[in-house]
């Protein structure tokens, strides 16, 4: 059996490893267009900041997969054509044809490039792939005045990274808040923290990049900002071109449609990772939420099913986490505005608390917002402050399990004065929402 995987990222390498574990005699080939496999794009800002090196964003190098797992990993190998039972690959200037019995498309996502005047100028960069992280760091090191376009997760993380290097940083965002998936009460706390470190310009639409051969300023509908480097962080899109070439159905989100077993609409063709849509476990609707934990699990599920097993991917609740300097930021499930747009009758609460009992030193602030429907079912949670990750993860599990406020209130959470308050913010939120 010949299995071919297009894309050596999280989903692709997880699937390849699972297939070889189950079917060690099968021939598994991975084509990756860069020289990085099993990579962690989420770590790019921390390479830029100098916290890590680009090579460390690979969990294992290609040689590990070849020697230890028997996977034929082809790097710097770009798939240029795919058809029924075959594909064509360009590698080292040569084109070759390969056959497959089963195919996994794990092509990930691509950065969105704004269609504005001057977008072809030098000095305009996107955050795409760990293979380019070291080059990106060198470019940023040479710049002094940087404009970041977009205040989503990538924009916020890059704002921290480059301002930590002593650069002058301006962040331009079309919407009236950073991190648009957050509700206003929580986003305003992020906004206040960002304004201490960078020049944050909200409600401004990008209109053009200007300069001779290299970008010299970013122009919006309200202002223009001089710069010697522009970082574009205006979002990403699913990389679906090869799937379309093969005739795979695209879903309503524009990403590749798959069933719960990661099978596409084409027989013997699977897809996983940031290029596919999945189900939201709160609404039951199809969503495209490209995040690394889901991509890894999708790859695992695809690997099991390609190998003849039976495993279903249940969907996601969209759990996300980041930070801006000392401020941790997390969310899971639906925001209040999302819940209302989905037709839920919403109850919500915002609480401010400490992370320790009052008499023990070291307690820090956390602000938590929890959203429930009229029956008390937890729909979503958001938090900013300290020790956010644990609480958002707890809520993610509660949302998946269908907890109501009463279930949350009676959850037997751990307590110790040096570590947690007796009334954890999670419990207080349920008490405030009532049941």
Model-identified regions with their sequence ranges:
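Beta1-alpha1 glycine-rich phosphate/pyrophosphate-binding loop at the start
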Residues: 1-71, 160-182, 390
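Residue-level detector of alpha-helix initiation sites
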Residues: 5, 9-13, 35, 109-111, ...
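Flexible, glycine-rich terminal cap/loop adjacent to redox cofactors
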Residues: 6-10, 14-25, 33-34, 234, ...
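A Rossmann-like FAD-binding core segment of flavoenzymes
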Residues: 25-29, 68, 73-93, 98, ...
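Rossmann-like dinucleotide-binding cores of NAD(P)H-dependent redox enzymes
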Residues: 58, 145, 153-208, 291-294, ...
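Glycine-rich dinucleotide-binding loop and its adjacent helix/turn
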Residues: 105-165, 200, 258-260
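FAD-site-proximal beta/loop scaffold in flavoenzymes
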Residues: 120-143, 213-217, 224-301, 394
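A conserved FAD-binding loop/helix module that cradles the flavin
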Residues: 258, 272-335, 420-435
């Amino acid at each position: 059996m010949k299995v071919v995987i297009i894309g050596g990222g999280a989903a692709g390498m997880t699937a390849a490893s699972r297939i070889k574990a189950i079917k060690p005699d099968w021939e598994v080939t991975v084509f990756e267009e860069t020289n990085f496999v099993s990579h962690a794009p989420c770590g790019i800002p921390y390479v830029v900041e100098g916290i890590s090196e680009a090579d460390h964003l690979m969990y294992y190098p290609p040689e590990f997969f070849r020697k230890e797992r028997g996977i034929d990993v082809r790097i710097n190998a770009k798939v240029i054509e795919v058809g029924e039972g075959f594909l064509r690959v360009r590698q080292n200037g040569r084109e070759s044809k390969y056959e497959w019995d089963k195919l996994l498309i794990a092509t990930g996502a691509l950065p969105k490039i704004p269609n504005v005047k001057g977008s072809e100028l030098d000095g305009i960069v996107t955050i795409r792939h760990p293979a380019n992280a070291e080059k990106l760091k060198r470019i940023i090191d040479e710049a002094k005045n940087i404009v970041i376009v977009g205040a989503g997760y990538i924009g916020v993380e890059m704002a921290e990274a480059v301002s930590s290097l002593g650069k002058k940083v301006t962040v331009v965002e079309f919407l009236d808040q950073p991190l648009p998936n957050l509700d206003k009460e929580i986003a305003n706390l992020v906004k206040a923290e960002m304004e201490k470190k960078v020049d944050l310009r909200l409600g401004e639409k990008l209109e053009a990049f200007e300069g001779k051969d290299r970008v010299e300023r970013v122009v919006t509908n309200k202002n223009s900002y001089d710069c010697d480097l522009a970082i574009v962080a205006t979002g990403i899109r699913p990389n679906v071109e090869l799937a379309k070439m093969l005739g795979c159905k695209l879903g309503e989100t524009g990403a590749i449609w798959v069933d719960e077993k990661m099978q596409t609409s084409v027989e013997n063709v699977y897809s996983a990772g940031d290029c596919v849509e999945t189900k939201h476990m709160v609404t039951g609707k199809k969503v495209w939420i490209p995040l690394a934990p889901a991509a890894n699990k999708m790859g695992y599920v695809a690997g099991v099913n390609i190998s003849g097993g039976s495993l279903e991917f249940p969907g996601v609740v969209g759990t996300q986490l980041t930070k801006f300097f000392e401020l941790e930021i997390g969310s899971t499930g639906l925001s209040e505005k999302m819940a209302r747009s989905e037709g839920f009758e919403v109850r919500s609460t915002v609480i401010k608390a400490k992370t320790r009992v009052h008499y023990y030193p070291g307690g820090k602030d956390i602000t938590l917002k929890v959203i429930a429907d009229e029956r008390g079912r937890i729909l979503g949670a958001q938090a900013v402050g300290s020790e956010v990750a644990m609480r958002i993860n707890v809520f993610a599990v509660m949302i998946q399990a269908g907890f109501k406020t009463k279930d949350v209130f009676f959850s037997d959470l751990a307590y110790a004065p040096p570590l947690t308050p007796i009334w954890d913010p999670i419990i207080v939120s349920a008490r405030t929402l009532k049941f």
